[in-house]
């Protein structure tokens, strides 16, 4: 009889994520201290906001890239995800992320008929055609951050944008433990998909127990 193996969920702990994001954070902080922002400065700030939004909302990178202005409800600290992989959903965000989005909107390039929150800073790929950011762009950004920080996943592979979503789900499970709430936030159609995070954490606990020696007096 075959045992059901727990699906591998690649994630980083909170402190590892902070270390991974540190170079981007420092560049964004330096950019905000300038009176006039260059194009690279704006790109850095945009990337920093996207990364933090994806993590805070446990979004898929494609969902963040396709966000439109009409999807923002900053007053109530929410964003609406439409046509996501798991369907439409409401995503609550912390105050810190809302402030980052507001800061981005202050410097966001204004183009006629541009519905997207995040766009290419330098222009569009085709004249008169506004396109959202390409999610593949962030694959390259993550490779760069991984090379800068040396942060890797447990299996030795490099973090990628979806790592943020997995990492946020694990953090939420550790702090909340309510799989139904996490399922709603992640937009999972099936609770079994969400239960993977609980199984992964249970396996981590089991691994830890196996490495612990001592305790009470042995008989």
Sequence positions of predicted segments:
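Conserved catalytic core of the tyrosine transesterase superfamily
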Residues: 1-219
């Amino acid at each position: 009889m075959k045992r059901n193996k727990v699906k591998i969920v690649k994630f980083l702990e909170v402190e590892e994520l902070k270390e991974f994001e540190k170079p981007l954070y420092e560049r964004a902080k330096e950019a905000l201290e300038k009176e006039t922002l260059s194009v690279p400065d704006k790109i850095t700030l945009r990337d920093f906001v996207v990364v933090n939004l994806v993590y805070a909302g446990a979004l898929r990178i494609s969902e963040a890239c396709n966000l439109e202005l009409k999807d923002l409800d900053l007053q109530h600290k929410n964003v609406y995800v439409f046509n996501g992989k798991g369907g439409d959903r409401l995503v609550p965000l912390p105050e810190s992320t809302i402030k980052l989005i507001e800061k981005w909107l202050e410097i966001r390039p204004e183009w006629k008929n541009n519905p997207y929150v995040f766009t290419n800073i330098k222009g569009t790929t085709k004249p008169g055609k506004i396109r959202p950011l390409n999610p593949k762009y962030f694959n390259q950004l993550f490779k760069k951050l991984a090379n800068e920080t040396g942060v890797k996943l447990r299996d030795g592979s490099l973090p990628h944008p979806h790592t943020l979503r997995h990492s946020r789900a694990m953090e939420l499970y550790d702090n909340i433990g309510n799989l139904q709430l996490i399922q709603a936030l992640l937009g999972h159609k099936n609770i079994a998909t969400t239960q993977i995070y609980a199984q992964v954490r249970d396996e981590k606990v089991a691994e830890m127990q196996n490495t612990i020696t001592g305790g009470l007096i042995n008989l």
